[in-house]
């Protein structure tokens, strides 16, 4: 049993709590900026499945030079701004493939991964093979049935349609002048 005389009441200034909170925020900020910088040096987008990281990053999008080009994919804004549309598309595709390992790509997305030239104005919504993944049509993706895709291959760790199937898909969908 504790007696009232055993309890010591101390007054602690509010600045101690503010300092601890600020230190914790600075450590989190430095850690996330270091991860974003490392991802930029590797030429990829930062992909996170961690809810705490995701919440921190989303709170700082638009500030701290952080961008979220696609859901769950992050980078430093100045690095993103310096990329060409082709580089942006490639990083986005690779990031989506890392976040969704069951996804496979076709059309212009697969062409980029195969190293084919794709005009900037043909880059846009993602081209996904419907592989049992839960992609909604509202996400702007163009879906292809698996039986139409044929056997899938891996290029740079990303599942894509075979090379000649990719060429055929692109030629069938591109304006005539691009097909030449």
Per-region residue spans from a language model:
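Short gly/ser-rich loop at a beta-strand->alpha-helix junction or flexible surface loop bordering the NTP-binding
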Residues: 2-180
């Amino acid at each position: 049993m504790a007696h009232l005389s055993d309890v010591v009441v101390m007054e602690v200034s509010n600045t101690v709590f503010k300092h601890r909170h600020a230190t914790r925020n600075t450590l989190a900020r430095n850690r996330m900026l270091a991860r974003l910088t490392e991802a930029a040096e590797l030429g990829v987008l930062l992909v996170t499945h961690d809810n705490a990281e995701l919440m921190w990053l989303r709170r700082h999008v638009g500030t701290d030079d952080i961008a979220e080009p696609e859901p769950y994919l992050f980078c430093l804004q100045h690095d993103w701004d310096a990329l060409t549309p082709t580089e942006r598309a490639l990083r986005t595709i690779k990031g989506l493939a890392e976040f969704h390992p069951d996804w496979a790509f076709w059309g212009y997305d697969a062409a980029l991964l195969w190293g084919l030239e794709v005009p900037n104005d043909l880059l846009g919504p993602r081209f996904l093979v419907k592989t049992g993944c839960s992609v909604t049509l509202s996400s702007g993706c163009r879906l292809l049935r698996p039986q139409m895709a044929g056997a899938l291959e891996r290029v740079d760790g990303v599942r894509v349609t075979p090379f000649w199937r990719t060429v055929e898909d692109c030629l069938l969908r591109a304006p005539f002048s691009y097909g030449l």
